[in-house]
């Protein structure tokens, strides 16, 4: 029971694949979440990846130019595909 409680009370670290308009809506909603935190972004488009990362204060090391790198990251718990 304690393990489940600790997981629920911790933040789910989200990654987003594809920083488009709907991804912005999702990222804005995460700002209001008690249990979710935006941790990473993956995009093949360098400009969009950097703009999205800057807007949502994503650390450079979690701005992936390859989808598999985001999916393989042990720092990402869940992925939203936009």
Sequence positions of predicted segments:
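Beta-loop-alpha module in the N-terminal Rossmann-like domain of NAD(P)-dependent dehydrogenases
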Residues: 61-82
């Amino acid at each position: 029971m304690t393990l489940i409680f600790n997981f629920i009370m911790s933040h789910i670290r989200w990654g987003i694949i594809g920083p488009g308009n709907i991804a912005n809506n999702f990222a804005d909603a995460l700002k209001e979440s008690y249990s979710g935190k935006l941790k990473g972004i993956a995009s093949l488009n360098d400009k969009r990846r950097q703009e999205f990362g800057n807007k949502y204060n994503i650390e450079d090391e979690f701005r992936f130019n390859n989808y598999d790198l985001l999916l393989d990251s042990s720092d990402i718990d869940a992925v939203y595909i936009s």
